Amino acid sequence: MSTLFTYDAPTMQQEESEEEPRTSIFAGALVTVSLIFINVVVYVVIALAGVSPISPAGQQLAPWGANFGPLTMHGQWWRLVTACFLHFGIIHLAFNMYILFQVGLYSERLFGEMRYLLLYLLAGVGGNIAGLYFHPDTVSAGASGAIFGLYGGLLAFLLMQRDAIPKEGAHALIKYALIFIVYNLVFGLTRPETDITAHIGGLLTGFLCGCVLSAPLSTDSLGHRSLHLGRILVVAVGGTALAIVAVEKLPKRDAHKDEWLRAVMVSPRLTVGQNDVLVYAGSATKSDAQKLAPALVKVGLLNKPGVLLVLTRDNNGAALLIPFKGDETAQATEAKLSAPGSSLSGLPLAHTTLPWEDPALLRSLAYVGPQLTAALGTTPLTLRLLNSKGEKHAEIRIDAVAAAPGRN
């Protein structure tokens, strides 16, 4: 992709300074170069830490600060920023940094360092919030939202400062920006792994911020520089406040589902038997998992390759989260727990019965529960039955001597 950033336009910083214009390609590009450097360093650090350098899974990036609804909306708001500096592999990073270098060099000269950095960060945050609205359960990362915001800011500048550069150069920039935006939006629609909503959110945020940051100020006003700094402060505070409100207005989420997703995504795990996994979260320890795992194998809860259970603990006791394939509309499940007294590896549930609605399954779990409590060495232990989405449908409370099955 060829660059159009060859015209040395007057900048908003030059309106405030009598410095001689610089001719180096990196002149006035301190922030752009710094952003690229930070992105590359982050990529190298996480790659050296074991994250796949080619195509990392979301589960690898989530612990490093990627945007993920169950974590971001659970108090880890900083992910709205850190996600802008993480990428899904070297190709993702290289493409974004190439585009950032092109649009960044010119945008930074137009807006100046402080306005440019503010525009970049707010656009990135705005894009990530948009992603949370539409794809809250998807791990997302990348500088694309912020970069789209720079294009939005560039268009806003050309709208608000129509005489800043010659019309020929302005028309070329508009054409270039629109081609980039349309092409990447259409391309993104053909790739399900692309978070197109974050791109659009960043674009709109960048345009709105750009309109405010590039609005002309009277050159004969007293305290001209103070007005510029005041405008930056207003946009920074206002943008942060709007981001907080936007996050607060996000749809309320199922607490049990988020507990499951958080545990699966970022908590440590213990591999058991034939590739079964026991995740331990909350205040549960590896020692807890090691004590419970043999009992889970013995009663048949961990006896099939690919099973994943979650052990969590808090002040109210321990809980074992048990997911079943299928949801409320399913006609069949993979559950194979049988009646009390058997090997718990035999009779499948009826095809028309969902696991959390099957009395025999609830009785079976209640029967084996005390064995799990004894192995774990704590009481109470709550068995929570989840669907494949992590939504709770039933739970059984196990104490030291009895089990009381129940639904909620």
Residue ranges and their predicted role:
Residues 2-261:
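A detector for small-residue-rich transmembrane helices and their helix-helix packing motifs
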Residues 297-305, 373-379:
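Short secondary-structure junctions
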Residues 344-356, 370-406:
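A short amphipathic beta-strand at an alpha->beta junction
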Residues 270, 301-323:
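Short edge beta-strands and adjacent turn/loop segments
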Residues 252-275, 407-408:
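Membrane-interface segments at or immediately adjacent to transmembrane helices
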Residues 322-337, 353-362:
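A short interface-forming secondary-structure element
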Residues 289-299:
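Short amphipathic alpha-helix segments
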Residues 311-313, 322-328, 387-389, 400-402:
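A mature extracytoplasmic/lumenal domain signature
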